[in-house]
A protein has these predicted regions:
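Bacterial N-terminal signal peptides that target proteins for export
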Residues: 1-9
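Short hydrophobic/aromatic segments of transmembrane alpha-helices and their interfaces
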Residues: 5, 61, 175-177
Length: 209
């Protein structure tokens, strides 16, 4: 009898543990983009902006999601933090895609300052019970290998420390490829935006399921 009871408890605990360990799907209906010119649609007509393409991609896949683009060309992490309160006033936001930091790197802002700003942004967003997808950036070597190392460590560390969703590099498959960038070699062209949209869509669908 004792053996039967122990077996019952054993299997009950297994079922309970497995049930608790499954990550619950997220209900996402409204997404806000918080970034700089890499996400704002710099140099492109409005119908080619990331918010339009990403929303279309998601809708065509059966996800009724609205995308609002609050990215501003030239913004640093400090600028994003300064206008965050206005962004948090947008009603019924389920997810914010945070893609700031590229201009910090171009301006040589100390990585610890960028990290501090992004951490404050993340904390304030989480306080509103809004999910975050952190889109990482990578530095060039123009400011030295030490700067690059410190900058590149910002995003994975923030993701880990805050337990938030993470897409390691916003410009994955786009950066340094002339076929996917405008003549300045920095900002994505329409084909580049489409690739970014595909990559972000995969991350969004992954956190919904």
């Amino acid at each position: 009898m004792k053996i039967k009871i122990r077996l019952y408890l054993f299997f009950f605990l297994i079922v309970l543990f497995n049930g608790c360990s499954e990550k619950q799907p997220k209900e996402i209906k409204k997404i806000v983009l918080l970034g700089d010119s890499l996400m704002s649609g710099y140099g492109l007509s409005s119908e080619k902006h990331l918010d339009k393409i990403l929303q279309k991609d998601l809708n065509l896949s059966g996800y009724k999601i609205t995308i609002i683009n609050k990215s501003v060309s030239g913004d640093t992490s400090s600028d994003g933090l300064a206008r965050l309160d206005k962004i948090l006033e947008i009603k019924d936001t389920d997810l914010i895609i945070l893609g700031l930091g590229a201009n910090d790197m171009l301006q040589g802002v100390a990585p610890q300052k960028t990290k501090k700003n992004l951490q404050e942004i993340i904390t304030n967003i989480k306080n509103e019970n809004i999910e975050i997808l952190l889109a990482g950036m990578k530095a060039t070597t123009s400011r030295g290998l030490s700067y690059k190392k410190k900058f590149d460590e910002i995003y994975p560390e923030l993701s880990k420390n805050n337990d938030i969703f993470f897409f390691p590099f916003l410009l994955k498959d786009v950066a340094l490829n002339p076929d996917f960038n405008q003549s300045d070699g920095i900002h994505p062209n329409f084909n580049g935006v489409k690739i970014i949209s595909i990559n972000l869509k995969k991350s969004i669908v992954g956190l919904i399921k």
